[in-house]
């Protein structure tokens, strides 16, 4: 009986360690990280939709920071993901929808988006957003095949 209790305790104590070593996609996260310093002038803007481009500005398995540039009229298509997202409006004006709530946000404003919440935006004045994600968006690191 004592051996079984010790075995169960040992297994239960290892589970958090194993969980911390993998993202939701099962990929290891401990060794996944960006460079320490990321310079805007050296990063390409990646397409992220019509009139939308992005630069990944830093990440590890636990967090990611992404700069997103919108042309006027561009749409951040409504979507969900399991990540917590916090967005800071650097410039421009956007109509954001999070769940059933719709608000106009502008430079200096922020948006908190809980995991699995439907959200999207329409760019009313060209601008830039800074998106932070926890855990990182591993899907942003997958490059489409030509």
Residue ranges and their predicted role:
Residues 8-17:
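Bacterial N-terminal signal peptides
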Residues 82-94, 99:
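Glycine- and acidic-residue-biased ligand/ion/polar-headgroup-sensing regions
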